[in-house]
């Protein structure tokens, strides 16, 4: 069973947690952290689809989740539907959060703002990307405390992993704090 964040009583505490986390995103900053550039050129249509979370920095809204994925789908109004999903082994259940993303500024630059609750947005900036095939990406949030390494497959080639760790470290991100996400379930 998958639990989708809506405004139902059982998920209210999780929704409040997401809001608090988003508020903590550097006062809802949507700008790229100083000294980091978002990828250009960027094609949101090619970025659509399912991505597996390979690694992340720890935050309460994902703590304890394995088999995390993010799916992006462009909407007719130009926004992007975001579905984040992960398995909570303590509850023996899938958790899901629905969000909305908007490109900020230049549509050929990989900078978006994402909201999982109302008018509160946090920055989402693709700082590294397989621009030829769109098979892997590294995303930073509004500051260096938010980082995700994503891939189209559940595993990332060692050479790509080493490259991304080098890039993250060069950008001032503490790669020793990365959590390598377990991607073993086949029921999700």
Predicted regions and their residues:
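Bacterial N-terminal signal peptides that target proteins for export
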Residues: 2-15
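A beta-rich soluble binding module of mature secreted/lumenal proteins
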Residues: 2-5, 22-188
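Bacterial N-terminal signal peptides
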Residues: 13-24
